[in-house]
Amino acid sequence: EFGADLGQQVAFLGESGRALAAAVRHPGRVRWRDTLAIAEEAGVNALPIVTLVAFILGVIIAYQSAVAMRQFGAEVYVADLIGISMVRELAPLMTAILLAGRSGAAFAAEIGTMRVNEEVDALTTFGFDPVRFLVLPRVLAALAVTPLLAVYADVVSILGGALILLTFQVPLVTYFNEVFTLVQMNDLLGGLFKCLVFGLVIA
């Protein structure tokens, strides 16, 4: 049974990869209206929870770090910690967890219901590819919204850290100058690459 399930998973991954490659070669055949609708549900409607979690994360990191760094008069370096940790690691990971829990579960439930109601079999009977009609729009939507949500989480968490450091007498100009000086484009690109991988795995 385990071998059969594993074989089905491998076959599904192969079909999904084939559909994704076909979408790159022939973008006009992609169901963009469905993709945009799914992206709105998975991305735009997730903004409130992403905002809340990212802001709280930035506040907690800033406060805990600033309390320790104040002993050495180095509160300003908390900006470096927030910038690097959020852009490289925490924002992509947090976004992926939220997307998996919220949108990934919705994807599975929706397609599972269609499977039970034999809608997937009906598509196959009428000569339509279920992977192209059902799976591909969700994969493309996840690939699109995961990096965007991560960048948004970066901004929100950095703003949350800025508010905390204001209470430690660190000026906003100094804070943002420290963040933008230390965080490089390679850090952002590395985080975005992780987002693409997470989005693909979740979808």
Per-range role (PLM):
Residues 2-36:
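Short, membrane-interfacial amphipathic segments enriched in basic
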Residues 32, 63-88, 155-192:
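Membrane-interfacial helix-loop-helix connectors in multipass membrane proteins
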Residues 33, 43, 70-77, 108-120:
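Membrane-helix/interface signature in polytopic inner-membrane proteins
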Residues 41, 45, 49, 74-107, ...:
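Loop-to-helix entry region at the N-terminal start of transmembrane alpha-helices
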Residues 63-67, 97, 101, 105-109, ...:
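Short helix-terminus and kink motifs of transmembrane alpha helices
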Residues 110-136:
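Short cytoplasmic-facing helical segments at TM-TM junctions of multi-pass membrane proteins
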